[in-house]
Amino acid sequence: IRDHRGHPDIAYGYYLRAVSAYRSVSEVDKDEGDTRKAETFLLEVINKFSGTDYALDASVKLNAIKNQRAAKELVIGKFYHDRKEFLAALTRYQNVVSEFPDSTYVEEALYRIIEVYVSLGLTQEARNTAVLLGHNFPASTWYFKAYEIVEGPLPRHITPKGGGIGRLNPFG
């Protein structure tokens, strides 16, 4: 890349480097060095060659990496949670929400935060987080579970599969 900056296919060179780094990313429980390197290269493709197929594919791969990192935070949080190390678990769950807000793991992370707050006796914090969960994910199974641990059993006419939660504002 350094020696051929003016080449008409330089975008492809950057893309190949990013894909190579992406393929070296390992499982959720492994070291993040390769992951961060892949993120850097993928972002470089996205920023330098926006609007290209390379940038589009790099964006998809970057999203997958972010989901993987969020999953790792969640797994570590559960590890601490299972050992009743609630503050360490809370930090990991909050990291999922703050660092990976577009990941598929935010719903569960919010629910786990509620669990921690309930375990610590922080009822108002649990309710506030449940409001956030319900606002952002009103039809989520995690929202129904949150309702049950904060407020008790769901009303009979409300079911996770059957709906009704959109009309229910249990935390308001």
Protein language model features and the residues they cover:
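Acidic, polar-rich low-complexity tracts and alpha-helical solenoid repeat scaffolds
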Residues: 1-172
